[in-house]
Design a protein with these regions (language model features):
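Acidic, metal/ion-coordinating pockets
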Residues: 1-221
Length: 221
C-alpha cells in the first residue's frame, strides 16, 4: 500500500523574503509606453507557489503611484501587485521599514489596492491599516486552513519615513501593548500563532541584543 507523504489535514505554508521593486526592475519591465510586464519574474518559483496552502511574502514596496521609484523610496506600478497575487502569493505582509516611503497617502493607496486584490484574488494582508476598524480586523489576522485556525501577527522595527501620529499605522515591535493585545486575541481564537517580525541588521548574520530581548518577550507572551 502506498501511503500519502502528508496526512490530509497537513497544512503547507511557505514564507518568502523581501519582495522589492528596484529602479532597474521597473526599467526592465517597462515597454516605454506606460505599460509594465512582470510575467517572467517568478516563473522559476511557480512549482513552489502552486503546491502550498498559503504563500506569505513581505511586500517591501508601496503602490504610491507615479513617479515609479526604486531605492531608497519605493513605489511600484500597480500591476506588479496583480502579478504577485496571480503567481499565488496570498498573504501580503505590510509591516516593514518601507511601508511609509510615500507617506500616509502612499500607505492608503497601497492598502486600497490590496483590498481590491482581496476581492478579486482572495488574498489577505496584515501589518498596516488605514483605520482602527481595519487594524482590529487584521491584527491578528486569523486564517482557517483545512480546519486549522492560524493567527498571523506582523510588526516592524521601524520605518524609514515619518509616520505621523494618526492613521494609517503600521505595527511596531516597540508597541508592546498592541502586540500583547494581538497575542492575547490569537491565544483565545486560534490554534497556532505565527509572529512575523521585520528586523535584523543589514549585512549581518548576527542578531543584536535588542532583537534577542524582543524575541524572548514575544515567546513569553
Amino acid at each position: 500500500e502506498v501511503r500519502p507523504l502528508y496526512a490530509k489535514d497537513t497544512v503547507t505554508i511557505r514564507f518568502f523574503g523581501d519582495i522589492m521593486m528596484h529602479t532597474k526592475q521597473i526599467e526592465t519591465a517597462s515597454d516605454g509606453n506606460d505599460s509594465y510586464d512582470f510575467s517572467t519574474y517568478y516563473k522559476l518559483m511557480k512549482g513552489y507557489l502552486e503546491d502550498s496552502d498559503l504563500n506569505v511574502g513581505n511586500m517591501e514596496f508601496t503602490l504610491g503611484g507615479k513617479p515609479y521609484t526604486g531605492y531608497p523610496s519605493f513605489s511600484a506600478p500597480d500591476n506588479f501587485a496583480d502579478y504577485i497575487a496571480g503567481c499565488g502569493f496570498n498573504l501580503f505582509l505590510c509591516a516593514n521599514n518601507h511601508i511609509f516611503d510615500k507617506g500616509a497617502s502612499g500607505v492608503k493607496r497601497t492598502l486600497d489596492k490590496y483590498r481590491q486584490l482581496a476581492e478579486n484574488f482572495g488574498i489577505y494582508f496584515t501589518g498596516a491599516a488605514t483605520d482602527k476598524a481595519e487594524h482590529d480586523a487584521n491584527n491578528p489576522l486569523i486564517i482557517n486552513l483545512k480546519g486549522i485556525r492560524i493567527a498571523f501577527i506582523n510588526a516592524t522595527y521601524g520605518t524609514n519615513s515619518f509616520r505621523g501620529e494618526g492613521w494609517p499605522k503600521t505595527n511596531m515591535i516597540s508597541d508592546r501593548k498592541t502586540l500583547a493585545d494581538a497575542l492575547a486575541t490569537a491565544e483565545s481564537k486560534a490554534e497556532l500563532s505565527i509572529v512575523l517580525v521585520h528586523w535584523g541588521t543589514e549585512y549581518s548574520l548576527q542578531h543584536s541584543a535588542s532583537q534577542e530581548q524582543d524575541a524572548k518577550w514575544l515567546a513569553a507572551n
